[in-house]
């Protein structure tokens, strides 16, 4: 026994057992520049967060092309850094807004559309600042989550739209920027996009994103 103790060593080892998440997510992205512009003004992030959560965010910079791309890239990079540092999602968005408002003489706004998935409970937390509608496709229904708040970078005190929804296996969360909405007739965007989403049985997220983009552009 003494020889075995010498072989095994005398140092203590801590083993932590954690329950695995109940859910996992699959993502798909499709984007194109506005008009003849090859550069899209939209940017996105997908980030693993502490506590078995995943964050997905879109940002649409003011205007189009390279300038809009720089704006949305800045927003996404700041958001990612703040979330990785442990700031709550809503506070992180408000901090970015303050930075953009106070640090510039001219107004350069960007939208933020964010969803945080709890992989243990299946709850999706949605935060929007000037963003387009989000569509939640379930087995038999499609729900629209709309934003009434301003984009970030416009006013000092920003109200962030906030909602929570229970998600189930097989649900789709479809997030779009205003480039998709602007390509559809005014006043009919949500209805037409819902029709496009409802009219397909695609289950692959990447194929779904490409299908929506193709249908809207056609």
Question: Which residues does each PLM region occupy?
Answer:
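Active-site-proximal, acidic helix/loop segment immediately C-terminal to a metal-coordinating Asp/Glu
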Residues: 63-85, 167, 171-217
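Short, glycine-/Ser/Thr-/acidic-enriched flexible segments
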Residues: 32-34, 51, 62-63, 119, ...
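Short hydrophobic-aromatic micro-motifs
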Residues: 54-57, 126, 173-176
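Acidic loop->beta-strand submotif enriched in PP2C/PPM serine/threonine phosphatases
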Residues: 37-50, 145-185
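PP2C/PPM-type serine/threonine phosphatase catalytic core
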Residues: 125-154, 161-163, 190, 194, ...
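Non-catalytic regulatory/linker segments of enzymes
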Residues: 50-51, 105, 116, 163
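N-terminal entry segment of metal-dependent catalytic domains or homologous docking segments
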Residues: 8-61, 67, 74, 133, ...
């Amino acid at each position: 026994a003494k020889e075995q103790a010498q072989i095994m060593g005398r140092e203590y080892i801590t083993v932590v057992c954690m329950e695995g998440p109940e859910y996992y997510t699959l993502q798909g992205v499709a984007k194109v520049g506005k008009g003849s512009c090859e550069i899209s003004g939209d940017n996105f992030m997908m980030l693993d967060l502490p506590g078995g959560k995943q964050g997905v965010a879109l940002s649409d910079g003011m205007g189009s092309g390279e300038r809009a791309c720089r704006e949305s890239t800045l927003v996404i990079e700041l958001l990612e850094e703040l979330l990785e540092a442990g700031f709550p999602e809503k506070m992180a968005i408000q901090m970015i807004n303050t930075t953009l408002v106070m640090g510039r003489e001219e107004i350069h706004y960007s939208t933020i559309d964010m969803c945080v998935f709890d992989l243990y409970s299946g709850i999706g937390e949605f935060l929007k600042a000037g963003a387009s509608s989000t569509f939640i496709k379930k087995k038999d229904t499609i729900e629209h989550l709309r934003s009434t708040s301003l984009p970030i970078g416009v006013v000092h005190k920003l109200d962030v739209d906030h909602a929570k929804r229970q998600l189930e296996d097989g649900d789709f969360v479809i997030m779009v920027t205003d480039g998709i909405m602007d390509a559809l007739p005014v006043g009919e965007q949500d209805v037409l996009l819902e029709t496009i989403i409802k009219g397909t049985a695609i289950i692959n997220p990447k194929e779904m994103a490409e299908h929506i983009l193709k249908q809207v552009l056609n």
